[in-house]
C-alpha cells in the first residue's frame, strides 16, 4: 500500500507483457485516478518515463490471454490453460469449497479429464509457424487444418513474429487429444503438426497453407513466473 496525498493504492508486480513491470490499483479510482496518473508521470520525468502500450509480441510470448481474442464466455478454464484455477485433485490451494458459477459443470469436467475423457473439442495451444514475419494484429481468426490438409479443424487467435526465435508464433485452438501435463492439466501434444491458412500478406505462396507445430506456452519465460507458468508442467 502507498499513500500519495492520502490516496490509498495497491501496487502489484504484474502486467500485460511478462516483463518486469508494475500495476497500480487505486482503492477509489472513480475519484482519484487523475491524481495518481499525474503523480506517477511527475515522479518518472527524471527517468524519461513515457506513456506506451504493451508490445503485442511480448504479451503473446508470455502466453497472456486477451479477452475476446483468445477466450470469451464460450470457453471453459481447462481449454484455455486456466485449469489450475479449478482443482483437479480436490486437494491444495485451488480446492474451492465455496459455491461459484459453473462449479458443478467444471468439477464434472475435471473428473472426466482425470478419467481420460475429452469433455470438450478444442484446446488452446502454442504454435510455431512458417510464413513471412507477422507484424500486425490479426483482424480475424486464421484457420488451422491437419498436417495432411483438408477441412479446418481449428483457428489461430493471436499470432506475431518472435524476434529472438526468428519465426512466427501464435496461440490457437486445435482438437483436444486428451494430453495432460505433469500436474494433470490439459495441454496440446508437443510436436504435433498442422497447417495454418495465412492471409496473402504473410503467405510464402498465396493459397498454400504454412507448416505449424505445437510448442510449449509461454514462448518466453516471464520476468516473474506467474502461477499458470509454474503449474504448466
Give short role names for the model-derived ranges.
Residues 4-233:
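Conserved, structured C-terminal
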